[in-house]
Amino acid sequence: MANGIDKLPRGIRNKNPGNIKLGTDWDGLASEQTDPTFCVFKESVWGIRALMKILLTYRFTHKKTDVDSIISRWAPPSENDTNAYIDFVCKEINVKPLDKLDNSIEHYLPLVKSIIRMENGQQPFKDELLVEGMYRAWEGYPTGSSAS
């Protein structure tokens, strides 16, 4: 690829910064899925939306509200060094593994950024794009500290 996109991390190339595996018919998927393992999205905002949708499912369906339980499900030991991932995220967002996160942009934006950084070795997105994708995911979900 002449524009250097082939040198970008896989998740950034695929517009899937959470490295979400194929299997769900996500909104915003590219018409051509060129990666045999991971989803390819039309635009990064859709990959960010999918990442946040998963985190909201963890919160509201599986009652995962702290970094330890969220990352243990996101990056299970069968595929990852889960403890190192948890440590990385906790340092990035300055919380302890069992600190409960509020269902708010103030808590989830840093979490999403740290997941993207861990998955790709970088976090190249502006906050505005991240927030747009996150709010697309939040449609229909409650927000705020009382939302569990």
Residues covered by each model-derived region:
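Cell-wall polysaccharide-cleaving catalytic domain and substrate-binding groove, primarily
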Residues: 1-148
